Amino acid sequence: MAEIYLAGGCFWGLEEYFSRIEGVKKTTVGYANGQVESTNYQLIHQTDHAETVHLIYDEKRVSLREILLYYFRVIDPLSVNKQGNDVGRQYRTGVYYTNQADKAVIEQVFAEQEKQLGQKIAVELEPLRHYVLAEDYHQDYLKKNPGGYCHINVNDAYQPLVDPGQYEKPTDAELKEQLTQEQYQVTQLSATERPFHNAYNATFEEGIYVDVTTGEPLFFAGDKFESGCGWPSFSRPIAREVLRYYEDKSHGMERIEVRSRSGNAHLGHVFTDGPESAGGLRYCINSAALRFIPKEKMEAEGYAYLLQHMK
């Protein structure tokens, strides 16, 4: 067994979230890395402790790297002393370790996050100090009070975890060699392929769609629907963090551009006219930005970990 301490805003929601992740054996909440050895809920403003979740996990079932990727899924790493509606030093973000060997793993994940975001993150990285177990009524708070306040979606624990470290972006020269002219123009130059006359508009087999530039999984075929727009349409991504969103005012229109996380490839746009029963979104994606992998080939191509999440 191993342990790590994570601060990420109100500890009620963060504890419930991590309690749902396979391999996490025990969670408790407390106050960490303050200026003095003792504190309580009424004093944390004065002692500068952070609301923190203590995780004990089985390294054979979930790694520290995976724990951290789950963590970054539900925090805003750029926000200072604020998560959701909660404001104050006690709601700062931080990763606090007790095993010196963990520091290198944490630093690597931090570096990857900063590279993806293009700026330094506001998450503390420190050895654990002055940890105080929180009062009993805070422990498993949302299990005792299912309708209680929570600033995160704890069901995000059930979304597939896609590790961006497995899907590195090739160099521009490699992309020019690997991709067709249309694939390169769409993904690297934000071009748009012709509607209806593209590879996957009418494809509805079981499987997954991955970023053509990196192989990072983006969409389940089960979330694809016929929209009539002429391009592949999806109601949601495999996991929300695999996509990036940008304001697009090109061609005299105001749209939300969708790009891939690891490859930074232009994929298409997202609109709010999708099926209401599936959340109301329509991800309108260029076939040229995707590669389809049939369900029967997923294991051979390294995507077996996603099979359990397919509809």
From Swiss-Prot:
This is Peptide methionine sulfoxide reductase MsrA/MsrB. GO terms for molecular function: L-methionine:thioredoxin-disulfide S-oxidoreductase activity; peptide-methionine (R)-S-oxide reductase activity; peptide-methionine (S)-S-oxide reductase activity. Has an important function as a repair enzyme for proteins that have been inactivated by oxidation. Catalyzes the reversible oxidation-reduction of methionine sulfoxide in proteins to methionine. Involved in protection against oxidative stress when the bacterium enters the host bloodstream and required for maximal growth under aerobic and anaerobic conditions. GO terms for cellular component: cytoplasm. It holds the Pfam family PMSR. Coiled coil: none annotated. Its EC number is 1.8.4.11, 1.8.4.12. Residues 172-295 form the MsrB domain. HAMAP family: MsrA, MsrB. Keywords: Multifunctional enzyme, Oxidoreductase. It comes from the Bacteria. Residues 1-155 are annotated as: Peptide methionine sulfoxide reductase A. GO terms for biological process: protein modification process; protein repair; response to oxidative stress. It catalyses: L-methionyl-[protein] + [thioredoxin]-disulfide + H2O = L-methionyl-(S)-S-oxide-[protein] + [thioredoxin]-dithiol; [thioredoxin]-disulfide + L-methionine + H2O = L-methionine (S)-S-oxide + [thioredoxin]-dithiol; L-methionyl-[protein] + [thioredoxin]-disulfide + H2O = L-methionyl-(R)-S-oxide-[protein] + [thioredoxin]-dithiol. In the N-terminal section; belongs to the MsrA Met sulfoxide reductase family. In the C-terminal section; belongs to the MsrB Met sulfoxide reductase family. The active site is at C10, C284 (nucleophile). It is an enzyme of class 1 (oxidoreductase).
